[in-house]
Swiss-Prot record:
Pathway: Amino-acid biosynthesis; L-serine biosynthesis; L-serine from 3-phospho-D-glycerate: step 2/3; Cofactor biosynthesis; pyridoxine 5'-phosphate biosynthesis; pyridoxine 5'-phosphate from D-erythrose 4-phosphate: step 3/5. Pyridoxal 5'-phosphate binds at residues 76-77, 102, 150, 169, 192, 234-235. This is Phosphoserine aminotransferase. It comes from Flavobacterium psychrophilum (strain ATCC 49511 / DSM 21280 / CIP 103535 / JIP02/86). Catalyzes the reversible conversion of 3-phosphohydroxypyruvate to phosphoserine and of 3-hydroxy-2-oxo-4-phosphonooxybutanoate to phosphohydroxythreonine. One of its GO terms (cellular component) is cytoplasm. L-glutamate binds at residue 41. Homodimer. The lineage of its organism: Bacteria, Pseudomonadati, Bacteroidota, Flavobacteriia, Flavobacteriales. Keywords: Amino-acid biosynthesis, Aminotransferase, Cytoplasm, Pyridoxal phosphate, Pyridoxine biosynthesis, Serine biosynthesis, Transferase. GO terms for biological process: L-serine biosynthetic process; pyridoxine biosynthetic process. Gene3D superfamilies: Aspartate Aminotransferase, domain 1 (3.90.1150.10), Type I PLP-dependent aspartate aminotransferase-like (Major domain) (3.40.640.10).
């Protein structure tokens, strides 16, 4: 049976990425060697790294605009530390918008480096919305936000325009929608949502904002060191980067971000329309802030849980259970999830309605 993978991450990837990755593991570029055993300094992998970095900037519309794309290790969680290390000045200040678990994790790390101003938070409402009315201090070294919140199913639809560097954690919605990415000075994202398997982290940074903290930065945490080493300061995670390149190529061939945005909108509209129509269900996020990537919803009557769980599992749906802090269900609709998989879930929801 075909599986419909709604996992929040690591998540579904395009079928062609699996097929090409499998071949590369057996014989990479007809070299007679596995991708898993080649030197990261070989011309074949250097070409992979160069193409991947260039394709990131091309897809985001940042080519030739003073940005560098890096493939690092440590996940987005390490970026919680690296961002203030590289951007918050000695005795400096940073402004953070608290919209969920990952934003609060970033705030926790930033507090070790200087004054960390939480300009707004939706924590008291269990992060069911994105705060709208807030003021960003003009003397902050940077402003940090999280564009999409996988656990609580909210997503920022607009971003403030300020005269300080803007940093954004886009781990769960990068490459999913059209934005003016030049409004951001630093973007970071764990690969395992819309780009590839777990194991590498993408950082896109405008070079001109670096080197201004006045502090010593350990080499492995220094963006400038990684830029100078062309993202190979140490041995990079070869396989995740190669798989990420394949996903980026797939996205480009599909028509780029504008093309995938239309598909993602169609998927989200289909599911949210059913959640709103079907009286057995209710969404957990405020309607205006609903995420196109992660739809969170509950059954109005928990007595129907066992039946619904059996029905969606029997339909080949996987990974639909919600995070423990929210409960209910979470349908993660990342780029590679086809519209037909969302239709299968909607059909199950309608079938439950007919049975009750």
């Amino acid at each position: 049976m075909k599986k419909h993978n709604y996992s929040a991450g690591p998540c579904i990837l395009p079928q062609e990425v699996f097929e090409k990755s499998a071949q590369a593991i057996l014989d990479f570029n007809h070299s007679g060697l596995s991708l898993l055993e080649i030197s990261h300094r070989s011309k074949d992998f250097v070409a992979v790294m160069e193409e991947a970095r260039a394709l990131v900037l091309e897809l985001l519309g940042l080519k030739g605009k003073g940005y560098q794309a890096l493939f690092l290790a440590g996940g987005a969680s390490l970026e919680f530390l690296m961002v203030p290390y590289n951007l918050m000045k000695e005795n400096g200040k940073a402004a953070y918008l608290d919209t969920g678990t990952w934003a609060s994790g970033a705030i926790k790390e930033a507090k070790h480096f200087g004054e960390t101003v939480v300009i707004a938070s939706s924590k008291e409402e269990n992060y069911n919305h994105i705060p709208k009315n807030y003021s960003i201090p003009s003397d902050a070294n940077y402003f940090h936000c999280t564009s999409n919140n996988t656990i609580f199913g909210t997503q920022m639809k607009s971003f403030p325009e300020v005269n300080i560097p803007v940093v954004c954690d886009m781990s769960s919605d990068i490459f999913s929608r059209v934005l003016d990415f030049s409004k951001f000075d630093l973007i970071y994202a764990g690969a395992q949502k819309n780009m590839g398997p777990a194991g590498t982290t993408l950082v896109i940074v405008k070079e001109e904002i670096l080197g201004k903290t006045g502090r010593y930065i350990p080499s492995m945490l220094d963006y400038e060191k990684h830029i100078k080493a062309e993202s190979m300061y140490n041995t990079p995670p070869v396989f995740p980067i190669y798989a990420s390149l394949l996903t980026l190529q797939w996205l480009k061939n599909l028509g780029g971000i504008s093309a995938i945005e239309k598909i993602n909108n169609a998927k989200a509209n289909l599911l949210y329309s059913e959640i709103d129509r079907n009286t057995l269900f209710k969404g957990t996020a405020n309607a205006e802030d609903r995420s196109n990537m992660n739809a969170t919803f509950l059954l109005n009557n928990k007595n129907h849980t066992e039946l619904f769980d059996k029905m969606w599992a029997a339909a080949g749906i996987s990974g639909l259970s919600g995070h423990r802090s929210v409960g209910g269900y979470r349908a993660s609709m990342y780029n590679a999830l086809p519209l037909e998989s969302v239709q299968v879930l909607v059909n199950v929801m309608k079938e439950l309605e007919n049975k009750i």
